[in-house]
Structure formats: structure tokens, C-alpha cells
Amino acid sequence: MALRAYVLIQTEVGKGASVATKVAEIEGVITADDVTGPYDVIVQAEADSVDDLGKMVVNSVQLVEGITRTLTCPVVHF
């Protein structure tokens, strides 16, 4: 069974939409929506393991230009 998580992203001012578009192209990302509030983009992602999820966030998501901070929240039950 795959692991599902939400990744909450803060971006540089005015970069939410472009970050969401770029993150949506990453393998394992189900949705990437630009939103209002303390976070600018909320991502729903899946991976085979916690290790794979961490690698995706660190090696792919966090490399997108305009991201200043991420918070990964694994789903407990789905």
C-alpha cells in the first residue's frame, strides 16, 4: 500500500501559482493547488514508503524555484 501525504509549501511573494504548476509535474504528486492562508501551495502526494516520500520532497519538491519552506504531513488512515 502506498503512503499518502500532504506537503504544505510556503513560497516567495507572488510565486504560488508558478510553484504549484511546477510541483504538479513531479512524479508522485497527485494534486498541487495554490491557496490562501499561511501556506501558498498544498500538495497531495503518494510514495511507496516514508523514505521514498522524503526523497521526493528533498530531491524534487524543495528544488523548485520560489519555495522557501515545506511541511510534510503523512496521512494516518485512507
Model-derived features with residue positions:
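A compositional/biophysical signature of low hydrophobicity enriched in polar/charged and small residues
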Residues: 1-78
